[in-house]
A protein has these predicted regions:
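Short aromatic-glycine-(Arg/Gly/Cys) micro-motifs in beta-strand/loop hairpins
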Residues: 10-25
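A short, exposed loop/beta-hairpin motif centered on an aromatic-Gly-Thr core
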Residues: 26-37
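Short, charged, surface-exposed hinge/linker loops at domain edges
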Residues: 1-6, 15, 40-70
Length: 70
């Protein structure tokens, strides 16, 4: 993966797994039984998200780096 998107990983008691969200890519998220598994799955889904957007002719946001919160 050459794009550096922010990935937020948190524990979900409801899903009993770690959830990885990619805020810059709408709907891009993954999960895993471990933190590392969630991260690996997120990296894979980012690539798939970009491939799908490219095939559909949709714009691909550039990574913004670290998101700032007020």
């Amino acid at each position: 993966m050459d794009k550096k998107y922010e990935i937020i990983i948190f524990w979900s008691s409801e899903d009993n797994s770690y959830v990885a969200e990619v805020p810059e890519l709408a709907g891009c998220m993954a999960d895993g039984k471990t933190y590392r598994e969630a991260l690996g799955n997120a990296e894979q889904i980012i690539e798939e998200w970009i491939e799908t957007a490219t095939k559909l002719g949709r714009p691909i946001p550039q990574p913004r780096g670290r998101l700032a919160y007020a």
